Swiss-Prot record:
Subcellular location: Plastid, Chloroplast
Oligomeric form and interacting partners: Heterohexadecamer of 8 large and 8 small subunits.
Protein encoded by which gene: RBCS
Keywords assigned by UniProt, alphabetized: Calvin cycle, Carbon dioxide fixation, Chloroplast, Photorespiration, Photosynthesis, Plastid, Transit peptide
Recorded GO MF terms: ribulose-bisphosphate carboxylase activity
Gene3D superfamilies, per the entry: Ribulose bisphosphate carboxylase, small subunit (3.30.190.10)
Comment field (misc): The basic functional RuBisCO is composed of a large chain homodimer in a 'head-to-tail' conformation. In form I RuBisCO this homodimer is arranged in a barrel-like tetramer with the small subunits forming a tetrameric 'cap' on each end of the 'barrel'.
Disulphide-bridged cysteine pairs: none
Protein name: Ribulose bisphosphate carboxylase small subunit, chloroplastic
UniProt GO BP: photorespiration; reductive pentose-phosphate cycle
Length: 175
């Protein structure tokens, strides 16, 4: 048997010409008066403050900010609900890690907080979480209360921030 040859229609493709110029990209454009030597944030330095290294305890994610208002808490809880995380409330009398009975880390050194009720699975709105924070404050007026965003798909705590602090330690940071 003789092999058969099939005629095919060949399409011509333009040969590779190399990379295009990046002159059209915004990164490479510079104004005529701009040079690297004129870059400065000196105007902003006057309004910056340095966080003191002693005397103010740092707690959770947002500890560098002033205490959150109810509106701020609503926005944070809305963020964790939109991220598909489950809101949980925890409270503890001492809001930081300490070692009282042993030098090695352990269960009783403040890493674990007491959970308030159950995680709020299926919570559709942040307005359901804030009344629970108020209920913790009524039941236990002195402890710290934090809100946790729990990712039940990855089984991890994704976000944690202080919702309320005991009276008298709002600005001083002394617990």
């Amino acid at each position: 048997m003789a092999p058969t040859v099939m005629a095919s229609s060949a399409t011509s493709v333009a040969p590779f010409q190399g990379l295009k110029s990046t002159a059209g990209l915004p990164v490479s454009r510079r104004s005529n008066g701009a040079s690297l030597g004129s870059v400065s944030n000196g105007g902003r330095i006057r309004c910056m403050q340095v966080w003191p290294i002693e005397g103010i305890k740092k707690f959770e994610t947002l500890s560098y900010l002033p205490p959150l208002s109810t509106e701020g808490l609503l926005k944070q809880v809305d963020y964790l609900i939109r991220s598909k995380w489950v809101p949980c409330l925890e409270f503890r009398k001492v809001g930081f890690i300490f070692r009282e009975h042993n030098v090695s880390p352990g269960y009783y050194d403040g890493r674990y907080w007491t959970m308030w009720k159950l995680p709020m699975f299926g919570c559709p709105a942040p307005t359901q979480v804030i009344p629970e924070v108020e209920e913790v404050r009524k039941e236990y007026p002195d402890p710290y209360c934090r809100i946790i965003g729990f990712d039940n798909m990855r089984q991890v705590q994704s976000v944690s921030f202080i919702a309320s602090k005991p009276p008298g330690c709002e600005e001083s940071g002394k617990a």
